[in-house]
Amino acid sequence: MTKILITEFINQDSLDNLKKYFDIKYDENLYENKLELERIIHNYEGLIIRNKTQVTSDVLKNAKKLKFIGRLGVGLDNIDTETCKNKNIHVQPATGMNADSVAEYVVSSSMSLIKKIPIFHNATVKGEWPRTKIKSTEIKQKLLGIIGFGTIGKKVAEYSTKIGLKILAYDPYVREINDKKIDAKLSNLNEIYEKSEIISIHLPLTDETKNMINKSSFSQMKNKPIIINTSRGSIINEVDLIDAYHKNIISGFALDVFEKEPIESEFYNKIKPDMNCILTPHISGVTIESNVRVSDYIVKKITDFFN
């Protein structure tokens, strides 16, 4: 029977279904032990992971039987895809399965930051009552700039269209928008930086996108935008982001991803209670519903692949 190794959490019903067809080893904490993964990977034809398992060249060197890697999520920066290609190992992300969850996070974070909820909350729990002292605005008719217009970027645009946002989108690989549920215009980075009141980032982490949003980018922002990042932390220069906030170049930010995860004290010590910001531990795409969709999708793909 084909052997499958699962190194991070998966929906239980999906796992039970997988066990009908494969010999499964499931250890949701195995990602923490790189040496153990390197030691045992030679036994398995299939591997199912999330974003914490590092599938490096050292792991793949020992993966003599490996034919399929299922990614319970979207980003592939934790997988040496070039080596996989050379070894003819199929890499399957769960494209689109968590798009609704991420889109909800982006819209809800945008609303919270536009309303300055983090600032109001902090003041209120301290016994203050700044009902008229702090000014907030409505989200309707704000200009949203979406950087990266793939499956998730388009889903964000769909949700944002419904609540009356104006939308600019940038993606060098998208030539036109043919979705009637989306009211958006394709644009360029310069226009997005200059005009947007909210900027949401939906890019893969590559050599091209690493540190892409930096001091130079912030210097072009004229409307004190909200910055939201649910893609990969290293796309934004975190030092430049904090600096832009303190200089009133941006009016707030929501980060679900960070250059180093878990977040380290060097960064979180810079975050003060009175800042208009939201920090979350890489959960924008992780909900009960999305976990079911992602897990079922990868289970179907790996079952189809081997049968």
What is each residue range found by the language model?
Residues 2-5, 13, 21-25, 99-101, ...:
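Structural/interface elements that position substrates and couple domains in central-metabolism enzymes
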Residues 87-89, 94-143, 158-159:
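Phosphate-binding beta-alpha-beta segment of Rossmann-like dinucleotide-binding domains, i.e.
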Residues 60, 64-67, 79-91, 201, ...:
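Beta-strand-loop-alpha-helix segment that lines the small-molecule cofactor/substrate pocket
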Residues 132-223:
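Rossmann-like dinucleotide/phosphate-binding beta-alpha-beta segment
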Residues 91, 105, 215, 224-307:
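Rossmann-like dinucleotide-binding domain for NAD(H)/NADP(H)
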Residues 1-92, 194, 214:
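An N-terminal-biased, well-structured beta-alpha scaffold segment characteristic
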Residues 52, 197, 203-205, 231-232, ...:
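Short glycine-/small-residue-rich Rossmann-like dinucleotide-binding loops
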Residues 54, 75-78, 93, 97, ...:
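Residue-level detector of alpha-helix initiation sites
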